[in-house]
Swiss-Prot record:
Lineage: Bacteria, Pseudomonadati, Pseudomonadota, Gammaproteobacteria, Enterobacterales
Keywords: Cell cycle, Cell division, DNA-binding
UniProt KW DNA-binding keyword: yes
Family: Belongs to the CedA family.
A biological process from GO: cell division
Functional note: Activates the cell division inhibited by chromosomal DNA over-replication.
UniProt cross-references to NCBIfam families, sorted A to Z: PRK10113.1
Protein name: Cell division activator CedA
One Gene Ontology molecular-function label: DNA binding
Pfam families: CedA
Protein encoded by which gene: cedA
Annotated organism of origin: Salmonella newport (strain SL254)
């Protein structure tokens, strides 16, 4: 007899999309860019959308992070 794939009594955890927090305490703000912070040696953009911050993936170049932030801003302007 084959075993069932799932444990029968284990509850199914429903997925809740993660809301990124504001930039953490140890992030260093870059003065030359509007939304870019340095985090663990990488460049990360934080954009406030509505009530919450959206965080970009880590980029190795600050310009890329800022481009991402600009794109997110544009998308949200269209959505509003």
């Amino acid at each position: 007899m084959m075993k069932p794939l799932r444990q029968q009594n284990r509850q199914i955890i429903s997925y809740i999309p993660r809301v990124e927090p504001a930039p953490p305490e140890h992030a260093i703000k870059m003065d030359t860019f509007r939304d870019v912070w340095i985090l663990r040696g990488k460049y990360v953009a934080f954009v406030l959308t509505g009530e919450s911050f959206q965080r970009s993936p880590a980029f190795s170049v600050p310009e890329s992070a800022q481009r991402w932030a600009n794109q997110v801003r544009q998308e949200n302007e269209i959505a509003d």
